[in-house]
Swiss-Prot record:
GO cellular component labels: plasma membrane; proton-transporting ATP synthase complex
GO molecular function: proton-transporting ATP synthase activity, rotational mechanism
Location, primary (coarse class): membrane
Subcellular location, record wording: Cell inner membrane
Quaternary organization: F-type ATPases have 2 components, CF(1) - the catalytic core - and CF(0) - the membrane proton channel. CF(1) has five subunits: alpha(3), beta(3), gamma(1), delta(1), epsilon(1). CF(0) has three main subunits: a(1), b(2) and c(9-12). The alpha and beta chains form an alternating ring which encloses part of the gamma chain. CF(1) is attached to CF(0) by a central stalk formed by the gamma and epsilon chains, while a peripheral stalk is formed by the delta and b chains.
Organism: Oleidesulfovibrio alaskensis (strain ATCC BAA-1058 / DSM 17464 / G20) (Desulfovibrio alaskensis)
Protein name: ATP synthase subunit a
Length: 233
C-alpha cells in the first residue's frame, strides 16, 4: 500500500496467508490466495450450474446463454469459424479475469490482477498459447511469415516482428495491472474523503471499468489468435 494510505483489513492477513516465509524471507502471498479463492468459486459455480442446465432455459440461463453466445459470435466475427475451436480458452480468460477484477470490490479482498505477477502470468500464457496455435496450424510457415513476403526483407522484418510480438505480453500485463491497481488506490481515496454511502456510485463506475478491462484483454487475445489462425502471408 502506498505511503500515507490506510492499510485495509484483508482476509488473507486474518487467515495468516498475507505473507509466507520462503528461505527465511517474507514473500507476499495474498494475491495467490485470492486467485485460489476465485478459482474455487468458479469451480463451485460451474459444478452447481452444470446440474441445473435445462432444455427449456429459465430466465437466468437465458441471460447467460445470450452473454456466452454473444461473445462467441464476437470471436467468430473476428477470427472466422476456426475461432470456435479456441473460444473455450478465450471465455475462460474473460470470466477468470473478470472475477479477479471484481474481487477488489469485495470488503476484505484485494484484486489478484492488482499484482503485476498475476497479469504477467496471464499475458505470458496468452503469448505462448497463440504462438502454439500458429505453429500447430502452419508449422514452419508460421515462423517464416516473421521474415516478410520477400527473403531480402528478412533482416529488417524479423527483428521488427520479434519486437512487436515480444511487446504484446508486456503491454497486456502492464495495461491490466495499471488500470486495476489505479482503481484500487482511487477507491481507497474516496473512502477517506466520503462516507461509505457516498462511495456507492463509484462502485458502479468501477464495476463497469473492471468489466471493460476484462473485455479488452479478451478482445486483444482474440486478435492475436486471429493472426495465428490466418494463413501466413
Amino acid at each position: 500500500m502506498a505511503s500515507g494510505l490506510p492499510h485495509p483489513v484483508l482476509l488473507s492477513d486474518l487467515v495468516g496467508l498475507g505473507h509466507i516465509n520462503v528461505g527465511g524471507q517474507s514473500v507476499e502471498f495474498k494475491h495467490v490466495f485470492y486467485t485460489w479463492c476465485v478459482m474455487a468459486m468458479l469451480f463451485a459455480v460451474s459444478f452447481i450450474v452444470r446440474g441445473k442446465i435445462k432444455m427449456v432455459p429459465g430466465k437466468l440461463q437465458n441471460i447467460f446463454e445470450v452473454i456466452i453466445g454473444g461473445l462467441e459470435e464476437f470471436v467468430v466475427s473476428i477470427t472466422g469459424e476456426d475461432g470456435r475451436k479456441v473460444y473455450p480458452v478465450l471465455i475462460v480468460f474473460f470470466l477468470f479475469i473478470l472475477c479477479m477484477n471484481l474481487t477488489g470490490l469485495v470488503p476484505g479482498f484485494d484484486a489478484p490482477t492488482a499484482n503485476i505477477n498475476t497479469t504477467a502470468s496471464l499475458a505470458l500464457f496468452c503469448f505462448i498459447y497463440y504462438n502454439y496455435i500458429g505453429i500447430q496450424r502452419w508449422g514452419a510457415g508460421y515462423i517464416k511469415h516473421f521474415m516478410g513476403p520477400m527473403w531480402w526483407l528478412s533482416p529488417l522484418m524479423l527483428p521488427l516482428e520479434l519486437i512487436s510480438h515480444t511487446a504484446r505480453p508486456l503491454s497486456l500485463s502492464l495495461r491490466l495491472f495499471g488500470n486495476i491497481r489505479g482503481e484500487e488506490f482511487v477507491l481507497i481515496l474516496f473512502f477517506m474523503l466520503a462516507p461509505i454511502i457516498g462511495t456507492i456510485p463509484i462502485y458502479f463506475l468501477f464495476t463497469l471499468a473492471k468489466v471493460l478491462q476484462a473485455f479488452i484483454f479478451f478482445m486483444l487475445a482474440t486478435i492475436y489468435l486471429k493472426g495465428s489462425l490466418e494463413h501466413a502471408h
